[in-house]
Amino acid sequence: MSDQALSFLKDFLAGGVAAAVSKTAVAPIERVKLLLQVQHASKQISAEKQYKGIIDCVVRIPKEQGFLSFWRGNLANVIRYFPTQALNFAFKDKYKQIFLGGVDRHKQFWRYFAGNLASGGAAGATSLCFVYPLDFARTRLAADVGKGAAQREFSGLGNCLTKIFKSDGLRGLYQGFNVSVQGIIIYRAAYFGVYDTAKGMLPDPKNVHIIVSWMIAQTVTAVAGLVSYPFDTVRRRMMMQSGRKGADIMYTGTVDCWKKIAKDEGAKAFFKGAWSNVLRGMGGAFVLVLYDEIKKYV
């Protein structure tokens, strides 16, 4: 195996393992966030049964659906996240060679910054093309609030994918893809671009204290998450459309979804669950730092 292939494989494994561990740890926060985001577009949650906020959601989930339901959809998320994060990190370095070849970070700061933004955004968009159906299934499984098998919309990951594919075809599994690409480019650009730029400005980027790394990563994930959050809300709402027919369809398209949320629920609705997203972002920050630490030993 060539050095290049070995380096790619190390990136793939380090990124994937770090991501799988952190995602499972923050899965309950992720599910609360998703429910708050999509409950207005759910056929299972009537207006009077909607969650009032994070605390109400955290209290009611174990009571109504059982404690383990906090991890509903987590298998899809781990399966999805392993290739997503691993491909992101692996492609990030390939894209960095394209966008940053021969750029001096101290003498050409803005070109260096722009190159980092471009490489981070391109890496995120590329990997999304491969794993979007898993992202879709993760959202639909997390939004499924039925308690027993009879009340559930889907029995599991395979059932969700096959049911929607039979109903809507491949298009159904890629519902909301366009707005996802927009959001992911904005998020990843900040996530990787600002993180790498900040680390690159330090005197000795190769030997940064783990606490400093974590603090930089924490700030980056919180800011990136909030900036791209409205795009995430719209894409999740669009995902909830798949499998619906006729009068059940809430939004005719992405633009209609943006308009209706703003008109019917107000601008605040775009940020429903955003606070839990900041908490979940701690897991994202942990991934960046853990990835750097794992790479030192492989």
UniProtKB/Swiss-Prot annotation:
Phosphoserine modified-residue sites: 7
Protein's membrane topology: Multi-pass membrane protein
Amino-acid positions noted as binding ADP in the UniProt annotation, renumbered to this chain: 80, 92, 235
Transmembrane spans: 8-37, 75-99, 110-130, 179-199, 211-231, 274-291
Subcellular location as annotated: Mitochondrion inner membrane; Membrane
Family: Belongs to the mitochondrial carrier (TC 2.A.29) family.
Residues modified as N-acetylserine: 2
Gene: SLC25A4
Residues exposed to the Mitochondrial intermembrane side: 1-7, 100-109, 200-210, 292-298
UniProt note: domains: The transmembrane helices are not perpendicular to the plane of the membrane, but cross the membrane at an angle. Odd-numbered transmembrane helices exhibit a sharp kink, due to the presence of a conserved proline residue.
Gene Ontology terms: cellular component: membrane; mitochondrial inner membrane; mitochondrial membrane; mitochondrial permeability transition pore complex
Species of the source: Oryctolagus cuniculus
Solcar repeat extents: 6-98, 111-201, 212-297
Name the record gives this protein: ADP/ATP translocase 1
Motif (Nucleotide carrier signature motif): 235-240
Pfam families, sorted: Mito_carr
Keywords in alphabetical order: Acetylation, Antiport, Membrane, Methylation, Mitochondrion, Mitochondrion inner membrane, Phosphoprotein, Repeat, S-nitrosylation, Transmembrane, Transmembrane helix, Transport
Mitochondrial matrix side: 38-74, 131-178, 232-273
Function: ADP:ATP antiporter that mediates import of ADP into the mitochondrial matrix for ATP synthesis, and export of ATP out to fuel the cell. Cycles between the cytoplasmic-open state (c-state) and the matrix-open state (m-state): operates by the alternating access mechanism with a single substrate-binding site intermittently exposed to either the cytosolic (c-state) or matrix (m-state) side of the inner mitochondrial membrane. In addition to its ADP:ATP antiporter activity, also involved in mitochondrial uncoupling and mitochondrial permeability transition pore (mPTP) activity.
A Gene Ontology BP annotation from the UniProt entry: positive regulation of mitophagy
Subunit-level organization: Monomer. Found in a complex with ARL2, ARL2BP and SLC25A4/ANT1. Interacts with ARL2BP. Interacts with TIMM44; leading to inhibit the presequence translocase TIMM23, thereby promoting stabilization of PINK1.
